[in-house]
From Swiss-Prot:
Organism phylogeny: Eukaryota, Metazoa, Chordata, Craniata, Vertebrata
Expressing tissues: Weakly expressed by neuronal and glial cells in the cerebral cortex. Expressed by Purkinje cells and in the granular layers of the cerebellum. Expressed in all layers of spermatocytes in testis but not detected in sperm cells.
One Gene Ontology term, aspect cellular component: nucleus
Pfam families: zf-C2H2 (PF00096)
Protein name from the UniProt record: Transcription factor YY2
Family in the record: Belongs to the YY transcription factor family.
Organism: Mus musculus
Task performed by this protein: Functions as a multifunctional transcription factor that may exhibit positive and negative control on a large number of genes. May antagonize YY1 and function in development and differentiation.
Amino acid sequence: MASETEKLLCLNTESAEIPADFVELLPPDNIGDIEAVSLETSVGQTIEVYGDVGVDWAHGSQYHSPVIALQPLVGSSLSSRDHDKEMFVVQTREEEVVGYQDSDNLLFSPEFGSQMVLPVNEDDYLQPTTASFTGFLAAENGQGELSPYEGNLCGLTTFIEAGAEESVNADLGDKQWEQKQIDGLDGEFPFTMWDDVNEKEDPIAEEQAGESPPDYSEYMTGKKFPPEGIPGIDLSDPKQLAEFTSMRPKKPKGDFPRPIACSHKGCEKMFKDNSAMRKHLHIHGPRVHVCAECGKAFVESSKLKRHQLVHTGEKPYQCTFEGCGRRFSLDFNLRTHVRIHTGDKPFVCPFDACNKKFAQSTNLKSHILTHVKNKNDQ
């Protein structure tokens, strides 16, 4: 495949015709070695010819670009009268053979966006063209567009850079990204990942979702119901009443920091270290341990073994108070039983003007039903 390297020579004239003595234009033989040469024109203007050293975009090597650049016209600014002048652009082409085997792939690489270089007619080695000076300035200022289809490759670099920038912007889209640090477990290094800012949840919604449910257990230990009752809870519903009376007071947290969050989605619990977090993760696991007698499933095998004591009738837990000796299958039942001996009645009726206390939550639940029934009958 052959590519075209162009040489431009721009002549400013006052008339719209090429001078008669301008018959043939030959490029200098060693233009790459020329740093700056002053030329005298017929109108007394001085122009300079530069040898531009750049990088060959096809081969990836340096080369001396055969581009002839002209000095600006007389005057720092152009008047409206100068804009109407016409400028002759004489383009000379020098053919060189490109031996790069993947040149086709390079020309149509995504780095160049939607731009494409078309081959030109090899017979047209000299093409005089005319262009309006106003249009030329507009193209240089970005208001116009130099089309590669017109045979002008001077703006090829600009097209390539613009196409590459548009390609990158198209890949990024409108999304915004930020780096997020993820802490690893013991023996693992923390790693960084990219997080989409647009897909972040609303901080207010996260805060509301992370809020723990109200602690109603205090109504079981002495706090009285408000006159309007508890919003959202109907104690006349047996299911809601059972959930209400089964609430346990939350254990007070220690003063030590808890920087490790549970990795399970929807769990807001925090832990002091990774080992505590891994131990907690078991409750989120599948309940693969199923009781053969009743079908109740458990996460841990130890919980299943403890449950099976109910079916086997084994009662390893015995009351130690003198003269009692009762035995129980579960330690929880033993702790509840001990309150009978100690006289501890932690469960207090939450209704106003009623101060009855109970040793077991089930007894308090039955007592609350009497209040609800009497209130509905009134």
